[in-house]
Amino acid sequence: MTRTAGLLLFVAAASLQSTATAQQTSPYVAAQRAESLRLAGRPWHAAETLLAAAAREPRLNATFVVEGAKAELYARRYDRARSLLVGQPWLEDYADGAALAVLAEAEGRLGLATQAAAHYAAARARVRGSRAALLAVREGLAWEAAGARDSAAAAYGAARAAGLPAIDAWVRLRQARVTRDTAVAFRLLADLPAPAAREAASARAQALLSAGDSVAALEALAQAGRSLDLARLALAHGDSSRARDALYGLMARAPETDDAAAAVGVALAALPPRTPPERVALARAMKGHGGAADARLEVERALRQGDSSAATLVLAGELFTTAGRYRDAERAYRSAAADPVLGALAIYRRARVLVRLGDAGASEALSGFAQSFPSDTAAPTALYMLGDMLGDRGDWAGAARWFGELIARYPADLRASLARFRLAAQALRDGLRDSAAALFRAEVVAGGPQRTTARFWLGKLTLLAGDTAGARATWLALVREDSIGYYGLRARREVDLPPLRIAAAPLPGPSPAVATWFGRVDTLLLAGLDTAAQAEVRAVLARAAQQDIDALLAWGDGLAARGFGPAAVRLGWQAALKSPNDSRVLRIIFPWPNRRAVEAEAAEFGVDPLLLVAIVRQESVFDAQALSPAGARGLAQLLPGTAALTARGLDVTFYPEWITVPDLNLHLGAAHLQELLQRFGGRVDAAAAAYNAGAAPVKRWLERPGADDPDEFIELIPYQETRGYVRAVLRNRELYHALYVAPTN
């Protein structure tokens, strides 16, 4: 649940009376339909329903307009929400300030902080008690965004006076940040409970800044480790030297953080890099946040300024490789090869670049690395690449030599496992079933990472040899020992067992302590304090190992329902460590918090809802804001280009900022999945592979001998990530069926 969702839950209660007394007109029916869609987790559909009704009705009553604005807020179309409400003659009198609160939220999202604060204040004046307190917190946040610290402090004080005991520590923290009287501010910060206490040092610095003591504020920010805030404040007061040290120190120390990403913008705008170390620090931060091209330019400038350190050369090699400049990458890695610390990495990466170049020296470089650095974690990969390269050329005798050395030296390594399967696949193509079986048995004996895969294929080979009873015994043993894994479920079908059914006992209700905690999180979300709610969730995750099984299950169930899917699943895995045979744990590891929305979108496009939820679980773990390193967004993890293309095909209005609206993302994801299923003749395995890797490579893979057999098709997917993804999606579909579909006669 987000800040906007929290506000609209709050506003909904205020709107009930007005809605109940509205006339039973066509717009009213549309509003009811929209509310039903919203409650089913389909806010975009709700907004579209009301938009269509509005186009048919020249005169709309206040209830319909407010419901439309709320729907637009849920759909993150904030400008539309605002335009529906601004200037309405009934705005200030509607449902005890409910319309004012919706307008204020839209304005806040649009960056109109002063207008938002004024409208929150007007809404607050029309109510009492906890509703007034929640609106006061939102008003304070808006005043803070507008830079009006005194008004923000007054609003937070009013919120505390109206009574929000569940979140008082967090409101105290906000109030202290904007209080000019440091004595009062420091009293507010005294004895804060965790996790709010972790923010006290930063709040103390902000209080000093509110009081005008910038020198003390700078020191407090330094002590709190808030380098970005320190740099901004130092810049504002003309201390560019301190700001520079803070910015570039942050980017060098923690380039992957959000603060480092923000530091890039500050540095480029006010303090561009001057020295090679600054350029390298900037490049590292750029690289981690989608700026590889700019990072490469900064590293090249550092090299031209005389930076010849191995660390910079290795970074340059990485960036050149990303850009396809393989010759430049090879030279950079070669120059770093003599370094005592990074030399091995440089030699290995140079060898990989030579492979990409098709250089005749690639084999010698890989084998030389594997022989010179046998204890390096990359040595098995080097040997695998040698075998893989020769195998792709059809030289299976040469491939077997290197794969054999890999298996002998690193028998339990993942690459050894992959080598066994490459050799086994070739043996099967050559009709050497006994050789393939020996390789599969070796994987089992070694306890390799693909041992369940090997056992499944041993069953298939046993069946091909005519030993039906032996094959059945192998598969039944696999069913017992890997009951919820992909190959255990696959073996289940081979022996004609009924579909897996997991009749889990009801999940426990929350204990008083857990219920109190959820009350605090819900109140934080209603108040618009999303970051504080996230801090509370992180605190629960940090102490999960100390909790009992029922607490973990209750927390996981509640968090999944509130949109914290990844956190819920993490708690589920923690519960599995404590009680591995408790079937209730699976409902936390494989939750279905948005079931109605998934089923509705699947039905609209004629796809299996179990397949769609299996993909969502694998792609985003039900995190509507999920962002992948490749730029995929939302529940169904769509790339912006894919989302836009799919929307165009559906004649759906789409803007990039809407991509994480939950049901719009699901809508486009379901449409994309249906298109892939149609393209590949209904083959779920191929469609799942294409969802992960794209349609073009899957088309090539389907043209290979043996691809008609789904088992062989999956095993021969050359991308390890995609191979694992397809298995996981198919396993997920079986488990969601086992957990959530009632048995039928």
Where are these regions (language model features)?
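N-terminal leader/linker segments that initiate helical-solenoid repeat arrays
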Residues: 20-70, 74-76, 83, 98, ...
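Residue-level detector of the short coil/turn that links helix A to helix B
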Residues: 41-42, 76, 111, 147, ...
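Short solvent-exposed coil/turn linkers within tandem alpha-helical repeat scaffolds
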Residues: 54-62, 88-97, 123-135, 156-169, ...
